[in-house]
Design a protein with these regions (language model features):
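Domain-core detector
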Residues: 1-152, 160-231
């Protein structure tokens, strides 16, 4: 029980950091609660992934126990990755995702407006995202189910409402194909590393990609079940 409490406390500390991102945006309470629940789950899976990786550092290549100094050095590298490098990127993503989820609740379902995809418009924008710039489609178009911003780590893209009579409609099939390209990057494993970003934070009431690798670590499903029971 003490181990479970320590585990839960560590996950909660990480969740508190991400919850700043959620609290910075105005949104309906139902949306806020759903996003906070997602943040808590993600934080728990992140904690589990870090501890699992750390546990594999205890032994050397021959299967013997590492000297403490060697283990501590390796652990510090893992800790820096998870709690500095990754955390910074994840927090910035959480801020953008929370803002976009909040905006989704404000978009009209009527016949007066369409939605338009816009980049930050500077030289830091990815070419694949530039090709999505200006995409204009109804809120009901399936494009927004998969390629609503943000579309990757450090993505600063935005979606706004525009009057229907001010901008021509985009070709849905063509921009969906461009969205697929923008979220495709085949890694060394042969898997698409960007496919996880094909979701809509506002429509699905999620902050983090549901297919994130943290959720695929050995034992992650048990952790998720434990966290859902002990929220």
């Amino acid at each position: 029980l003490q181990t479970e409490k320590a585990y839960k406390d560590l996950a909660s500390q990480t969740a508190d950091i991400f919850n700043f991102a959620v609290s910075s945006s105005d949104m309906p309470e139902v949306m806020r609660t759903a996003l906070q629940n997602d943040v808590y789950l993600f934080s728990g899976l992140k904690t589990h992934a870090q501890l699992f990786e750390a546990s594999r550092l205890l032994l050397d290549e021959s299967g013997g126990l590492k000297p403490y100094s060697a283990f501590a050095n390796d652990f510090n590298k893992v800790n820096k990755n998870y709690n500095q490098t990754y955390l910074n990127t994840e927090y910035e993503y959480a801020v953008n995702a929370a803002q976009m989820a909040a905006k989704w609740t404000e978009f009209s379902d009527g016949d007066r407006y369409n939605l338009q995809y816009r980049t930050a418009g500077d030289n830091r924008v990815r070419d694949s995202h530039t090709r999505l710039n200006g995409t204009t489609l109804p809120k009901s178009d399936p494009f927004w189910d998969l390629y609503y911003a943000p579309n990757g780590w450090n993505c600063r893209c935005n979606v706004v409402e525009v009057l229907k009579d001010k901008y021509p409609l985009s070709d849905s099939k063509k921009v969906i194909a461009e969205g697929e390209k923008a979220t495709t990057q085949i890694g060394k494993s042969g898997k698409n590393q960007l496919e996880i970003f094909r979701f809509n934070p506002g429509k699905q009431k999620l902050i983090f990609p549901p297919g994130h690798p943290y959720g695929k670590v050995v034992g992650a499903s048990k952790v998720a079940k434990f966290l859902n029971i002990n929220k």
